[in-house]
Amino acid sequence: MRFWLAFFVSLFVVCAPAAAKSKKKNEFKDPRDKQTYRTVKVAGLEWMGDNLNYKTAGSFCYKDEDDQCMVYGRLYTWDAAKKACPAGFRLPTHADFESLWTAAGADFNAGYLLKADYGWSGDTNGNDTLKFSAMPAGNRFDDETYGNMAKFAFFWSGDDSSEGVAPGNARVWYLTSKSMAFGYMSKPKNFGFSVRCVR
């Protein structure tokens, strides 16, 4: 009896640190405000699996309600987004998002693999195969109003000088409740959109 007790105690001691290490491996704790984010590896890049929620100038909660930030993260102007990621992470480039799109199948159903499996209006949730868990956080307009909650997820890229990007705009990748596509557009830099940091 004492042998088996000693065996199980030894097994627990050996296995427990490994379990803790595994848990931390897929998480990142922001030293600036102690918030923890899931991380996922896709196509050789490590993405945050949650929208950034670091409070800084030029960032907002949907409809200025703090509770929304706890679910959807903050909405950032492009200038704020460029500076918001913690050390070691950065705002994704257009090429980074293209790699994500390719990993999701590079077709009109890519959004199905990227969307969270809850929260989207209508019957348009994803299956979250890649664990990117895109949430429909909506956006802040330049007149300080808000819209598109449950209908759109917008993510800033770091590109503002690419072909097809108008002066004063930057490239935004988006998912919509209208389809399972994952695409991009050009939007004014003073709009508020979500941020996913990458490294």
Segments the model singles out, each with a brief description of its role:
Residues 15-20:
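Sec/Tat signal peptide C-region and signal peptidase I cleavage site
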Residues 6-14:
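Bacterial N-terminal signal peptides
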Residues 1-4:
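Positively charged n-region of N-terminal signal peptides that target proteins for export
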Residues 21-199:
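Conserved positions within compact, well-structured domain cores
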